[in-house]
Swiss-Prot record:
Membrane topology, record value: Peripheral membrane protein
Keywords per UniProt: Membrane, Mitochondrion, Mitochondrion inner membrane, Transit peptide, Translation regulation
Protein name stated in the entry: Mitochondrial translation factor ATP22
Gene this protein is translated from: ATP22
InterPro entries xref list: Atp22
Compartments where located: Mitochondrion inner membrane
Biological role stated in the UniProt entry: Translation factor specific for subunit 6 of the mitochondrial ATPase. Required for assembly of the CF(0) component of the ATPase.
Protein family according to the UniProt entry: Belongs to the ATP22 family.
Presequence range in chain numbering: 1-56
GO CC terms in record: mitochondrial inner membrane
UniProt GO MF annotations: translation regulator activity
Keyword Membrane: yes
Organism: Saccharomyces cerevisiae (strain AWRI1631)
Amino acid sequence: MLKCICRVYSQPLAQMVTSPLFKHMGSAGTYTILPITNLRHLSTKNCPLKIKSNRSEPLQFGDFERQVPCSRKSGSSKNVQKRLYELRQLKTVLSETFGVTEYASFFESLRNALHINNCSENEKKKLLYDIILHQHELYPEVARKIGFYLPGEVHRWFWYRIPKSESFNHYLFLLKSDVLLFTSNYCTRFTNRLIKGTEMERQLATFQIFLHDETNIKFIMEKVLKLHTFDSLIALVNGLVKAKNFRFIKVFIQALLQKLEQHCYSGKDGAKQKNLRYVKFNNTLLYYLLKSGNVELFIKTFQEELKFIVSSGLLNHIDGNEHILNFPIHHYLNLLRISNRQEELFNVISCLQSSPLMKYKLFKEFLMGELIASFQAFRDPKLVCKYLLSSYSSKASANILNALGIWGWLYHSKSTTLTAPTLARELKNKNNILPNTMRIGSPVTVPILTELYRSLLSSSSVSLESGQFKNCLLDLYYKYKSFLSEEAHKYRYWRNDTGILNVFLNYIRFQAREPRLAYNVLLDFYSQPFAKKVVLTTTLCPFSIVAYKNHTLTQAELSELLQVMHKNGVPLTFKFCSAMVMHYVKMRDEKGARSWYNKILFGGFEIRHMALIQIIKDQGWPFPKNFDETLLTELVENNNIKEPTDSTLFTDEDMFEEDGKPRFNDDDVNKCTNIIRETLKSLN
């Protein structure tokens, strides 16, 4: 019954029961406390609970709180404190029962607090925190076993009232108070905000901040299981895998498995739901095996999953659940691409182009992404553009390419913007090379454009003289900047991210060999009004590209970079901090280097970078407590450890090059391709 209360009832529970436990009387802290003799009578559906007195928890969440005040540290009005003290006196009685009425009372108190008119927002936040905190204290067993559900309007109020700088402490308060996460889109927004923030914020949102001490792992993972749904935990683990953050990945996969096993499947769709969840779990496992390079186990898991999907009858329920085939096939195509097996990739795509899966837009976008990314091996931007125009809306996409200056450099080898009639005439001569089933219809997306920029600049860096290539780079950059200012808002699905900017900076620094120009371009980009809306979507920060080994920059210019990062909310990354450590070591400024190393320690970054490890060892600095000491053995055994090259440390594996090339034999490829064919036959 408790699970139903916590996870199902989203409508005001006060309508379902008798009088609430507390009735608000109109001021910030005045409650009428109903007589104790009536409390048991009020509860229509009770759940007996046992109090576990003096339970010691291995973790003190207060250790992680920032200087920004939150919760009870801020204090509350004397009236509120007085009434809350009175509530504590009821703890012995109230802790024995918890049901619909108690939840309704809790909800009513929160909603009444939201509607107070004669107090400041800060006082209202304190009051909401106090209500949540004391609900947690009154029902410790409920908190320990199932957590607390908050009404959506409370999460909404928090989202719009709590400053971005206080998100860390707010989220920490929710965790301390055992508030169920992902029961509201607004709570999810807090999670996403933290994941896109600093390393500390990312570690809080993923609970990793508490896991560095092994004694905390059991307690924290129990909290993860309690506060997350299966789907939200899947999303969390996928995010860790995407970032190749494998420090605690086995613990999270075990938690996912527990979540999978503990769910109760009932009703006529129970078996189907159980099978669907198993496939979701398996897809996450496949993703991990792909990113970690475990090809042998990936192949086995992939084959077994497709066999299970067919044998379980899930293909009969593909509509609305197309992800069950989308993701495993996408992961397999990704493996073929990064293994440089283009021929096999094209063979699989030829099997797929007439399958029922092609009616799903997301699947077609997956397919085109892998197909176009695979063309990087050929250094042929015109080939990339042909497929782009054949798949996406050709007229809208051609207009975008023309405005960006790509069309001019690609087909005319110069900076030019065509008139509409000329562009239409040239577009008419471009033959469609894909079947209609593979057409997406919408304008080209930013990730595909990023691949086209990569291909064009890679080709131009070879075909053009250095001066011409520099002019090409700057012309494309200025037209891209103009497009973001004047045109991008016209396209509904346009997403301002750092992908294309990273491509420009990479080619300016490492191909054109213009490190100071890269610095000027970066500052120019972030001086534009649109820069505030640019999102970091990869693990690579553009500031890292500019700062790393850029010895042309003065101390004042590095300080300016930091100011621009702060102004635009760009978090410090491990790569940027490492770049600064190396900069100061080269300048023989031990104090400056240690200051930046302290930022790495404070941020909780994982250190596996051998050149940095060498610096730490040489300087006699302490290693972080979660440091893998086997890396020191590797350092001793390999006397040729050098500072990493430009293309290995400060380029993004997902954008510029992959870590190593997974290898698997032709027999494995044939088996996987054949099982895809058999699965598609069953789907037809």
